[in-house]
């Protein structure tokens, strides 16, 4: 078991977890015998141990009659480590989380249990996994922390509100009888907050228009006699506010209250989720604190998956169903397998490290759901969207483009709920995506797969774990398990074929494109040379030589470019600067963006104002935007990054270097546009960009990646390096030919596992020099009925394409690295399509395990019936005709 260095399924399918010095596994009856110290495999992961600070909180919780859940305690341990790493932990006097499992837990001062614990006065209301409220100024929680415990010129105090109520309210504070002290009103009017910082009441009134929504972290900070600044959700929004009076406090020395303040009849009608009292924290520390403790609070509120970090915990892991990669398909497959009674484990790939990596690309910003027919999105993913719409977004649940789009924050909430077995219908009041026992192990990636005949018996991870399973699922975005299992695979584009596949292979010459001013707009001739007209001067950044591949020939390096799907908002209350502190990011050089300067100059010369839609595709979900490559063709897709990723091959460090280049490209582009002062940049474009901000409620944990806060950590990989290459069946663009395979006709296979509903959409492979002009090579987009599934825009996708040939491997499934042509994959690659196939994959795995047969030998009608009866609110359709 885990206490001996390994993880195996425990009673009732619940993980027995390696909780060194910590709490009991969730759902497992505690045993009176002590937990032995695990013995890690030599060279493998080290034993996990809670920090002493976390142990103190856990001991205090147990003493209060409310032991902490192990999975949630691990998330607290992680938040404390982040706080210590920033230097904020040592400066804090008190840290409270009101969204706890019990009132006894929420009263504990996490920073120093036993000192400044909350005392309940009157009858404030505590709601488990939510927050605290009050109906009267006589009902509150007293911290016991005196005002003078923080220095007049050395303090940071913040409160975390979940409500948008405005009024003459006090969320938290300490005042003497003269009204002097520290207090926070997170929202006084629609545009203002009222705070004081050892000053007379209302002496600070940061009236940034429409900034103060009442929700998020807010509070005053002071580190000198006259300079006070105010922070909202980790971002300084009112810097260096001059105080008209620097007041002193008399002998009363009142204590800080939460849900009110001494000496005032004002109270608050807002719901509060947390607070802290500290010596002065720097702006960087505040941002990190807001991110770390918001992330922890979200786990307390919506769900805390059991997560083992890279190199810590179980040396051996055993489960019936093992999903590799933290993608949405892996989550859905593991979730449904657990729902079907199998023991499961998700094993992180090389790019997976933090909780924000779980769920894959939607967690990393891809939240505007692409589907020609939104109603084709069904099953678990549709239930996730329904839950997000009704519970998290509180909006109408509709099968429309907008109704099926989401925000990374809402999506993360759904993921956390799904992977926490304590999130039952009874506990939450919702029957949607009820939590299952799905542990996650971050590993640094795979290094080997052990085979017995055609069966994978175990896999080995980069951090030295051995994972044994009965059926394996490759949900990674690279297809590494496909490769390591010896399954034939395809890298890059195959040569052109017949019919719709004539658009495959290397597309040059007549198929090359130019930069353009807008979709269908003016095509621009852009010189590719450092000195225009002089090839001897070399090419500008991002332009490569023509590779000399014959038109239609195979293109082994033909991988679509990588991107980062940024999460922006134009709501002022959700503001984090696009280029923080106006400082150039690592690797920045203005010369990298010369191609944009020339595009803008050519547009101006053509009397065209280059619109922001040409630069960036900005799609909205409730005021939060998914930012993608724009209509002008050269945009946030990192130039030629697919070529670099193909060249990186099996090297994880080389892949990470490409990720870093993508981050540098996009963050540098934002800096160049906003701050370089290049005269060629249209003023209107700068003005448009100034209306957007990074959303500080998303992308809260960059881990060790070096990515700044509020930027997505992982790059968007549009296609795997390694696609399954079956001899028996390969889905291709002709399967989507609505002319030769019209609606209602029979597909090549009727063993449907998902439906495809999108255009052939392949982004450019190369930005290159062709005849002294910049050419955009490799792009394909065709949304006609011929190429996108006929009039109904729906194409069935079969079982034979998600399992390898039986001669290669008999216990492996993938709904990501499927057996498909690269061209057809341009339509298949949408997250809902892969997610629905993953749900059926779980039914396939269950059938194969129960009958001890190969995944290729399952009885499809039985699998189909099981998938349709899965209990989803909107069941899968699995149409068997075109």
Question: Model-derived features: where do they sit?
Answer:
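Extracytoplasmic low-complexity segments
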Residues: 1, 6-17, 24-30, 34-154, ...
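Extracellular glycan-interaction patches encoded by glycine-rich segments
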Residues: 247-283
